[in-house]
Amino acid sequence: DDILFDFKEYVTSGVRLCDLKEVHFDAGNLPDYSDIHVQQLYLLRYAYAYSFEYKRMYASLIRRMNPGMEIAVTSIGCGSMIDYWALTRVVPNRCTIRYRGIDTIDWSYRMEQRPQDDVLFRNADAVELVSKAKRLTADAYIFPKSISEFSKSDIEEICLPSKAISPAAV
């Protein structure tokens, strides 16, 4: 709701909307996500569609993992944490989520945390952060719509076998 209100306020302030007409999120285009208006446009355009995809993904993952009372997820390139929001819709209410979101952009809008969850956002380079970790301890590692923004060598660095990522989590 805040996003729509904020964007409407921006639009009615007399700005040149032609600037946003040039913003594209497809075909390898990387818009300036640090611009709050690009964030608003992106979220208004894609948040619900992506959350539906993530809900399906997490539902499938949870069926395979059967996490019990807690699940730990690290989201690499989490943006506004839409994938966390989707995860909260799939796990039982009694299940606690330990969510670690990493993104190079400090998004102005983030999904609201449930009271029982342990949520931490890190505004950092994911490749650097993960490669410095001695051991990866989450149950699942997610690349929500961000995997195409990483080079092959970045992916290899993140997924080093010595970090002991379980096969169900990749």
Describe every region a protein language model picked out:
Residues 69-79:
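Conserved class I S-adenosyl-L-methionine
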Residues 166-170:
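Conserved beta-strand signature within the Rossmann-like core of class I S-adenosyl-L-methionine
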Residues 98-103:
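Conserved SAM-binding motif I beta-strand of class I
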Residues 27-65:
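Class I SAM-dependent methyltransferase Rossmann-like catalytic core
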Residues 138-154:
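A short SAM/SAH-binding and catalytic strip from SAM-dependent methyltransferases
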Residues 110-135:
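S-adenosyl-L-methionine
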Residues 1-24:
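N-terminal auxiliary segments of SAM/dcSAM-dependent transferases
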Residues 80-94:
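Conserved SAM-binding loop of SAM-dependent methyltransferases across substrates and taxa
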